[in-house]
Amino acid sequence: SPEVMGKSPNRHNKLEMSVEPIGEDVRKFLKEEYEEVQRNADEQYEVRDALIEAGMDDEEADNILEVHEENVFVNASRGIKNLREIQEYLLDAFKEFCDEGPLAGEPVIGLMVKLHDAKLHEDAIHRGPSQMIPTTKDAMRKGFLQADPELIEPKQKLRVDTPTDTMGDAMTEVSNRRGDVIDMSEEGDSSVIKCKLPVEELFGFEAALKSATNGQGFFSLIDIIFEPLPRNLQEQTILDIRERKGMKQEMPSLEE
């Protein structure tokens, strides 16, 4: 996102921040390896080096203030007066934001938030948590909504075994449920289809597969992954989730 500004409710404090997606290799490292590396590291530079090896920029890795799930908060500023006094509030806001993102109150993953600058009131009483947490969330929300966020959905990677003569019918069942075929092979008289299917579409799949393959087809789970929901389903799904949660029945905007 471009650099955006968040203002405190009392108008005495301003934060300049930006939001961008984390590279897939870094995100995967944060998900699968970061906690173990941090737990076993004798020195902090070992964690830094592991992040750089995963693909993070040197300067970003040097200035991480917080890692939360698969998201990072980076201090990209050049010396902000009184930053230490408000840092705890900024990081609390960051974690709350990541736990309930602005699209539909769902968790956010793969996010890098950068703090570029801050203008803070001289008197500490005017830059407490009730001022700085909303300010931080305001800036992050503006940046997030300008960074082309997408709703992602869980999918299951499956192995489908079917007699070769009913393979086409099995593939039809997969495609009818927004599934994608990854690979096909033959093992003796059987065909093996490796595919991925949205979890939402799996209800009734086993019965449908049995019906399409004369009772001989079956599937097994390989892995669970997350991928962006198709563009044409994004808005309606977001609105449906917002309705279920009692949120405003409209897409989030910068003006909120």
Predicted regions and their residues:
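Accessory interaction regions appended to the cores of large information-processing enzymes
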Residues: 1-256
